[in-house]
Amino acid sequence: DPASVLTPDPLPLSVPYRDDDLLVVDKPAPLPAIRSARQGTHTLENAVYAHLGCPEQFVYRPVSRLDKGTSGLMPVALNAHMHDRMQRLLHTEEYVRAYLAVTEGAPAQDAGVCDLPIGRLAGVKRCIAPAGKPAVTHYRVLQRAENGRALVYLRLGTGRTHQIRVHMAA
């Protein structure tokens, strides 16, 4: 299984910030963030491993992950201490997860909060589910197009799998 072996993938990475404890990578779409049997070795995890020079004691510590089809800044802690600090910060008002999305169909309101629980549908699919986990997405429509699409600014209050997709489809 190629996913079980860490394999350097020398992709050209855009790294807008790096210090001894933290690396911030501009993850391109459609690059997967982590290795898995389905993704093979072409992942951000393998690219970061190569970027850091293939250290012997490498542990991949993403602070949060972006879906395969999502591009954006993704923080990766370079040690356990920073990972713990960032994980604590992740659930505070100080850590802002904001996105721009083009939606098929525009939200009815120009701005609002989608506060609907998200649960598992089948496998990795997610949906609005009364018994699901709480999920909060703040949104503001920046531009509406004649074709029904919209450019929407989104800020996550929680970080559920596929939260933006599920909430924008609700």
Enumerate the predicted regions with their spans.
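RNA pseudouridine synthases
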Residues: 1-170
